[in-house]
């Protein structure tokens, strides 16, 4: 009973902290859709706590809390993108956003230890948390990639961002276990079966593959001429192998079942010709 109360209080504290943050951000842009949605959910959560809700609702509270985090950080990310990631403030702001997007998963594991995190938050929210962190680092690295002089002075930092981004995006692809084709599931066409077997469940999964391929390409480009990193060799990702494997799947999907659906493979093929 005491543990349940402690968990509920911890989440309540975070909710009211987010409410203050959301209110401050709304003074910048009152009509922002994401901040309005976050504010609406926060009002519901505050009402719940004021009326002494049941602790058994903790998973649902965590899901709502996670959606608030996603909405608020999306607004903050858009500000960074619009400002083209200022060199002086972006590193700190990005680490802050990554921490904010990690907290729901950490809280779910700590506050509902008897259940797996993906059961508490749900597959879609957990996927979104990984996607958002990986996509943020992709956008940041895409901008840095155009700042050649900056990279010359900060290769290790650039490679670290690429490695973190690829790890997050790979985790996103692994949230849903690939469907086994012999587990009794009946598919109406082989294309659907192949998609699910490869872990491709949506357009976002395909875009994730392309992002991974590009980030691996950038890493290989600079990793070959920057071996002074202090990270242990066994902890580094094999960017060339990962990029090649992921982009092969991407091209096969886009030129196979998805042919004519607007997916372009020219860039993927060009990267593959360099990685292989």
UniProtKB/Swiss-Prot annotation:
The gene is rimoc1. Its main location: cytoplasm. InterPro entries: RIMC1 (IPR037657). It is found in: Cytoplasm, Cytosol. This is RAB7A-interacting MON1-CCZ1 complex subunit 1. It comes from Danio rerio (Zebrafish). Belongs to the RIMOC1 family. Plays an important role in the removal of damaged mitochondria via mitophagy by controlling the stability and localization of RAB7A. Required for the recruitment of RAB7A and ATG9A vesicles to damaged mitochondria and promotes the stability of RAB7A by inhibiting its proteasomal degradation during mitophagy. GO terms for cellular component: cytosol. Pfam families: RIMC1 (PF17716). PANTHER family: RAB7A-INTERACTING MON1-CCZ1 COMPLEX SUBUNIT 1 (PTHR28494:SF1), UPF0600 PROTEIN C5ORF51 (PTHR28494). GO terms for biological process: mitophagy. Signal peptide: none annotated. Keywords: Autophagy, Cytoplasm.
């Amino acid at each position: 009973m005491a543990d349940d109360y402690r968990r509920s209080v911890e989440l309540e504290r975070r909710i009211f902290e987010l409410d203050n943050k959301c209110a401050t951000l709304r003074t910048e842009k009152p009509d922002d859709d994401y901040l309005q949605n976050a504010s609406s959910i926060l009002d519901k959560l505050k009402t719940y706590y004021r009326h002494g809700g049941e602790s058994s609702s903790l998973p649902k509270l965590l899901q709502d809390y996670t959606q608030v985090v996603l909405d608020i950080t999306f607004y903050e990310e858009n500000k960074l993108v619009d400002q083209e990631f200022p060199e002086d403030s972006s590193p700190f702001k990005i680490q802050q956003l990554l921490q904010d997007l990690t907290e729901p998963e950490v809280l779910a594991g700590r506050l509902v230890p008897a259940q797996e995190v993906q059961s508490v938050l749900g597959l879609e929210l957990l996927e979104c948390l990984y996607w958002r962190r990986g996509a943020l680092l992709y956008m940041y690295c895409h901008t840095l990639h155009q700042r050649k002089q900056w990279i010359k002075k900060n290769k290790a930092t650039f490679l670290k961002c690429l490695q973190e981004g690829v790890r997050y995006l790979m985790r996103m692809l692994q949230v849903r276990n690939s469907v086994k084709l012999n587990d009794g599931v009946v598919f109406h066409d082989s294309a659907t079966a192949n998609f699910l077997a490869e872990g491709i469940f949506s357009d976002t999964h395909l875009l994730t593959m392309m992002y991974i391929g590009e980030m691996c390409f950038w890493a290989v480009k600079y990793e070959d001429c920057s071996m002074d990193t202090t990270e242990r060799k066994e902890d580094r990702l094999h960017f060339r192998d990962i990029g090649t494997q992921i982009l092969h799947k991407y091209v096969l999907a886009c030129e196979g079942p998805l042919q004519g659906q607007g997916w372009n493979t020219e860039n993927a093929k060009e990267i593959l010709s360099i990685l292989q």
